[in-house]
Amino acid sequence: MVDLSSTAGSLKFALKRGALVTAANWQVVLVQFVADTLFKTLLAVPIVGGLVLVALVVGGNPFELLRLEPSQIISTMVGVLLAQPFALAAFLAALGLVLCGGSVLMFAVKAVSVTVLLAGDRIAGPIEQPPLRLSSLKQANQSNVERFITGVRSLFSRYLRLGIGLTVTYALLAGAYMALVFGPPATAALAGPLAVTLASLGLILAVTLVNFVYLLLQIVIAAEDCGVLEAVPHVARLLRRRLKSMGQVLAAILALMLMATGVSILATAALGLIAFVPFVGLAALPLQVFAWLVRGVVFQFVGLTGVATYVRLHRTLQASTVPVRSDGLQQVTRA
């Protein structure tokens, strides 16, 4: 029997355990990276098609549109498509189809990821305690085809309902953002760029918190084998009793994401300088592709490390509720 509370109070050990469990199940990292890349690639198809459609309507060259600033590209596409209702409907239908199909794929992949990480954390033992042995990593590796199928079969329908709720929440946030940016200002002091800046910061914060709660709901649904609504009180209890630890893990994961982004930007800039060197610049393209692959895998690894860490915190909270029998009655002792 593993002592789940031995390292519960240590952020360092919790993150270390999450990283080791994720590394042991490296197959899940690659699966999620491939699925995320496929989703983004499919999403680019209707967008590129929209650019070509706009270029054909205005009689220009699609490559000339790509040389514009992103804001100019978006404004040009919106202006042209609004003037062509049929083209706008076709573009929105294609974009919506890809979004729906890609989202369903990502829900299935996340069901696999959470199932594997739950099993890995359950059987890993005190893997975060030194010395680290290869046998411990092999024991924590729970990635196999049978578990993948089991995860999709048992969690997909619930994750799909949860994802629909997430989509509705995103739509409400987007509507509120558009109302704040394009609607009449509440006060004269909030007019102009200040309103856009505050609304953008508020949207980023709201999306981060929504994604955080969404991830916790996914974990609790899988760990407790319950429905979406039944998972809500479990998440509320987890946040109430482990708010500090959860906040520290979230801050650590976001910091790692920012560091990885900074390193990626520096690497891209350095490779961009190499591209101007004759002959040597030929090596820039494969290096850029390699850097992109490494960046994508690192991002998925960091994200899944957060999932594994939250799984651990949830299990320690569940283990802190110990049934005790006294005078023939069952009492519950909470940590």
Regions found by a protein language model. Give the residues of each.
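Hydrophobic alpha-helical membrane segments
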Residues: M1-A335
